[in-house]
Amino acid sequence: MAQLEGYCFSAALSCTFLVSCLLFSAFSRALREPYMDEIFHLPQAQRYCEGHFSLSQWDPMITTLPGLYLVSVGVVKPAIWIFAWSEHVVCSIGMLRFVNLLFSVGNFYLLYLLFHKVQPRNKAASSIQRVLSTLTLAVFPTLYFFNFLYYTEAGSMFFTLFAYLMCLYGNHKTSAFLGFCGFMFRQTNIIWAVFCAGNVIAQKLTEAWKTELQKKEDRLPPIKGPFAEFRKILQFLLAYSMSFKNLSMLFCLTWPYILLGFLFCAFVVVNGGIVIGDRSSHEACLHFPQLFYFFSFTLFFSFPHLLSPSKIKTFLSLVWKHGILFLVVTLVSVFLVWKFTYAHKYLLADNRHYTFYVWKRVFQRYAILKYLLVPAYIFAGWSIADSLKSKPIFWNLMFFICLFIVIVPQKLLEFRYFILPYVIYRLNITLPPTSRLVCELSCYAIVNFITFYIFLNKTFQWPNSQDIQRFMW
């Protein structure tokens, strides 16, 4: 059985890489020059490739750390000595873009290993489910698209997934180092290093909580009321955190992540903020509706798992049973949409992104719609939480805290910001039946075909520019 799974995995990886190479060739023919954010990333990488590492050579418009450029130089530069290629060829646009294609292969393998580690090993989880789940996430449209451009997404995903995998195997020093590498690709990845530490803490809390529940005589007095379970957990957390033995044990397990956290704090103090370069366009704010956008995004791409008649029926019965609670959550959500909805200047200034059309033709045209969608947001959020109910409550707590910290401060609505939390979520839901995975994979294939076709063939020009423009995520 294991041998068959190995054959299936190899076939899936080989076919995906073959298709990716064909798409890469099409991208290379269509895009001879840097496009979108590549106009910043590619010249900077080429300067590094030529050996110009001084700060005077840094483009101030770049807001991320140089992890992508350093890794790219480390990958392509040896080709000068191995294949006797010229520096012009090695540092070309095509070669630098190809680095992300290599990252995509690494991501495929890491996803497979993570599905093996995260999902409980039982007879119900067949080899075809694991391979199909890996293939599906590897071609997740928003992530897959950026494998063909010189963006930070593929490398950022690689080091974050690698850090998560090492954390699950208990190799926390390696995990923290890989978390640092992910931070060098995108500063907000520090939160996913915190998530790895939180994963360790959640595991220990879960063990202690199970011990607490198994006791015949509970030390805590019985609590009754609508929030009894919540208060009981809160009391447990307070009691647990008051124990020096527990805290010292957690410190011994998580000290590599704590050290990384101190390094991050030092960076923020020295740099004067988390953003480098052009900070005017990346100011943090409390953009609470970002959570609702993420819930909608996740519902759209995971609809085979999150949207079903039984799920809707269960949700409606809960609404009927807890009507007052639902009303309170709805009112709070409406208030957050009303007071904390922002439209970043880039959102409305660039008509090459799909988010531009979502905002302009939907939210901006029908102002009332953002309030009418609140019940759908609540359903999506509940459905996501319900799909993660197989995970311990403390794991869920850590995940949603990290999700909140990662996306809420972002003023710009950008689908790329949702990729990592979506992948972490998708890795941790119970392995779906094969039929749902086939449905999900088919939908991803259709979305990918449409987006690639539009990007490569449906070009346009701005009135004041002769450059060819393309639609993209």
UniProtKB/Swiss-Prot annotation:
The keyword Iron does not apply. The keyword Transferase applies. Its EC number is 2.4.1.256. It is found in: Endoplasmic reticulum membrane. One of its GO terms (biological process) is protein N-linked glycosylation. Residues 28-64, 119-126, 172-175, 278-283, 339-365, 414-436 are extracellular. Keywords: Endoplasmic reticulum, Glycosyltransferase, Membrane, Transferase, Transmembrane, Transmembrane helix. Pathway: Protein modification; protein glycosylation. One of its GO terms (molecular function) is dolichyl pyrophosphate Glc2Man9GlcNAc2 alpha-1,2-glucosyltransferase activity. GO terms for cellular component: endoplasmic reticulum; endoplasmic reticulum membrane; lumenal side of endoplasmic reticulum membrane; plasma membrane. The chain crosses the membrane at residues 7-27, 65-85, 98-118, 127-147, 151-171, 176-196, 257-277, 284-304, 318-338, 366-386, 393-413, 437-457. It is a multi-pass membrane protein. It catalyses: an alpha-D-Glc-(1->3)-alpha-D-Glc-(1->3)-alpha-D-Man-(1->2)-alpha-D-Man-(1->2)-alpha-D-Man-(1->3)-[alpha-D-Man-(1->2)-alpha-D-Man-(1->3)-[alpha-D-Man-(1->2)-alpha-D-Man-(1->6)]-alpha-D-Man-(1->6)]-beta-D-Man-(1->4)-beta-D-GlcNAc-(1->4)-alpha-D-GlcNAc-diphospho-di-trans,poly-cis-dolichol + a di-trans,poly-cis-dolichyl beta-D-glucosyl phosphate = a alpha-D-Glc-(1->2)-alpha-D-Glc-(1->3)-alpha-D-Glc-(1->3)-alpha-D-Man-(1->2)-alpha-D-Man-(1->2)-alpha-D-Man-(1->3)-[alpha-D-Man-(1->2)-alpha-D-Man-(1->3)-[alpha-D-Man-(1->2)-alpha-D-Man-(1->6)]-alpha-D-Man-(1->6)]-beta-D-Man-(1->4)-beta-D-GlcNAc-(1->4)-alpha-D-GlcNAc-diphospho-di-trans,poly-cis-dolichol + a di-trans,poly-cis-dolichyl phosphate + H(+). Highly expressed in heart, placenta, liver, kidney and pancreas. Weakly expressed in lung, skeletal muscle and brain. It is an enzyme of class 2 (transferase). Residues 1-6, 86-97, 148-150, 197-256, 305-317, 387-392, 458-473 are cytoplasmic. Its main location: endoplasmic reticulum. Dol-P-Glc:Glc(2)Man(9)GlcNAc(2)-PP-Dol alpha-1,2-glucosyltransferase that operates in the biosynthetic pathway of dolichol-linked oligosaccharides, the glycan precursors employed in protein asparagine (N)-glycosylation. The assembly of dolichol-linked oligosaccharides begins on the cytosolic side of the endoplasmic reticulum membrane and finishes in its lumen. The sequential addition of sugars to dolichol pyrophosphate produces dolichol-linked oligosaccharides containing fourteen sugars, including two GlcNAcs, nine mannoses and three glucoses. PANTHER family: ALPHA-1,2-GLUCOSYLTRANSFERASE ALG10, DOL-P-GLC:GLC(2)MAN(9)GLCNAC(2)-PP-DOL ALPHA-1,2-GLUCOSYLTRANSFERASE-RELATED. Interacts with KCNH1; may regulate KCNH1, possibly by regulating its N-glycosylation. Interacts with KCNH2; may reduce KCNH2 sensitivity to classic proarrhythmic drug blockade, possibly by regulating its N-glycosylation. Belongs to the ALG10 glucosyltransferase family. This is Dol-P-Glc:Glc(2)Man(9)GlcNAc(2)-PP-Dol alpha-1,2-glucosyltransferase. It comes from Homo sapiens.
